[in-house]
A protein has these predicted regions:
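Membrane-embedded alpha-helical bundles of multi-pass transporters/translocases
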Residues: 2-137
Length: 137
């Protein structure tokens, strides 16, 4: 096993530190609640009653988390083994990071009217899967 240099350790720490706001801001405190409110309004404008619309919005968000979590859980062992055997980690970190940045930069399309609701949900969780996949390397 190759010995990690201080440069590699600091680089990994910086990468991990820089990716954490996505989880805090995106999943937990800002985008998740915003998505739920916008989705509830969207469902209410489609004729669903208030409480049912809120439940449907939360269900949609949690379904996205469930599907992406399962994808991550099933692919992580294979990506980890590939990372360990290939020895070329930086190109894969770059690939998944670019995928993450492109997907997350497109969530601006979710307007308060609910335009592109499902597309933004898919993009957000593509970004989530890509961010988690980059951490395997």
């Amino acid at each position: 096993m190759a010995q990690a240099t201080k440069k590699h350790i600091w680089g990994w720490m910086a990468f991990d530190w820089a990716s954490q706001p996505f989880y805090t801001v995106g999943l937990t405190f800002v985008f998740g609640p915003y998505f739920a409110v916008v989705a509830a309004e969207y469902f209410m404008s489609s004729g669903v009653e208030g409480g049912a619309a809120k439940a449907q919005a939360q269900s949609l968000w949690s379904s996205g988390q469930t599907v992406s979590g399962l994808i991550i859980a099933f692919t992580a062992p294979f990506l980890g083994a590939f990372a360990d055997n290939s020895g070329r980690k930086i190109p894969w970190i770059a690939f998944f990071s670019v995928m993450f940045v492109v997907a997350i930069s497109m969530i601006w399309m979710l307007t308060p009217e609910g335009a592109a609701l499902y597309l933004v949900l898919i993009l957000f969780f593509i970004a989530f899967i890509a961010a988690e996949s980059a951490l395997n390397f």
